[in-house]
Amino acid sequence: MFKHSEYNLLETKKFIELTKSAMLNTEDFEKWNSIKAMFGIYTERNRGTYMLRPRFPAGLLNIEELEYFVNICEIYGEGRVHLTTRQDIQIHGLSIQKLIIVLELLLEKGYSSRSAGGHATRAIMTPPMSGFEEEIFDVTPYGDAITSFILENPDYMGLPRKYKIALSNNEENSLTAKISDLGLLAVEVNGIKGFKVYGAGGLGANPKESIVLKQFLPKEDFLYAVEALKNLFIEHGDRENKARARIRFILQKFGRDEFIRLFEEHLNEVYRTKSLKVFLEDKKEFLEEDIEVESIPNLFNGRIKGRYAYYLHPTNGDLSIKEAKILIEGLKKIPYNLELRISNTQGLFIRNLKGSSIEEFKNLVKDFSKNELENSIACAGSTVCNLGILDSPDMLRTILNHFKDKKELSDHLPKLRISGCPNSCSAHH
């Protein structure tokens, strides 16, 4: 479990106290309502309820943590555990009274939803197979370090707009890094490991692929890039026009060469004024070899022969309480440690499976997706999201039901990405 700092937990506690007073005082409610999104809280459409999004850095959690959140969703939520497209779990259907209870329960366990939404630095994306597959190096610790850094620095909240950062462990997993505000792609040049730095990308209205800001950055210098682009964003971001407030519009305004010059200028200033080098060890875990198994849908090889990862994808990212409890009890019976990683595709990677467990495991996950079509992604849609135009989850369910008994056809169909508005939460671009 990621360990939040005392400062971040204290700020979370202050917000909970404000939430309590907001129920009683109009002025406090207005203040609370203006900042609640930065604490991962959004109003649900026509319901009088809220959605809460706690942070799960790198999507990491263990079986006990998953069970804890399932219980919270069962008692206080609406009977489902929603896996998101940014490696988090969302709890839906919370009244303001239940929201306060859940916030306090999560704080007691050391969780925080701070900076999980709004005009803030969002969840740091890391590949869910990083540390398990062949790669330049495991970028997970770097994502955790960025998370710790931004949550210790208040100026990473209250930005002109959201600031999205993604890391990639190799070129094959580089897509997310190339469509983010800041992307850090692990590379090796002349035997030295570091990051290729991308910036000013994004989906939604006016989608744009990132540009290369720096061909090579020593891997211990990653926080300098994070800080430099944030400072550029604060200086040049448009706080008047929300529709043009993302970093990619700064690029559009100044052009490629000038934007890169501005980034270099800010980068040099951060190098001059701050000490942000972080040296992290590459961890290579060597495990005993196990038996190999034949390829099955959603099963992936790891870099250790005989170790596997399974991608579990519930429809629309929604695990029912019943499904989740059956899954948890089954995972508990596996007599060795498993690693769980929430993906950015509304799914869950179950890592470190031994070949000897696969047959039993297949029975446990038999009711989940078995092909690319069933791995499709749909955003929250118009029944929940205030911005939604289309009921995208229902559309996906209708499509999947149509092909339910047509396996000879559906096995050859691609994954769909359905967004209920132009914001591209399903990454349909």
Where are the model-predicted features located?
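Short, flexible, solvent-exposed loop/turn segments with mixed acidic/basic and small polar residues
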Residues: 41-46, 77-83, 235-240, 299-304, ...
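Acidic, glycine-rich loop-and-beta core segments that form the ion-binding/anion-interacting portion
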Residues: 265-346
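Mobile "lid/hinge" segments at catalytic clefts and subdomain interfaces of large enzymes
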Residues: 2-4, 157-261, 429
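Short amphipathic beta-strand starts and helix->beta connectors
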Residues: 35-41, 68-78, 199, 231-234, ...
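Small-residue-enriched alpha-helical segments and adjacent helix-cap loops
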Residues: 21-27, 49-194, 224, 310, ...
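Generic structural signal of hydrophobic/aromatic residues within well-ordered alpha-helices
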Residues: 5-6, 12-20, 35, 146, ...
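N-terminal basic/disordered segments at the start of proteins
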Residues: 1-65, 173, 181-184, 190-191, ...
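Terminal amphipathic helices with adjacent charged low-complexity linkers/tails
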Residues: 97-98, 107-109, 234-296, 352, ...
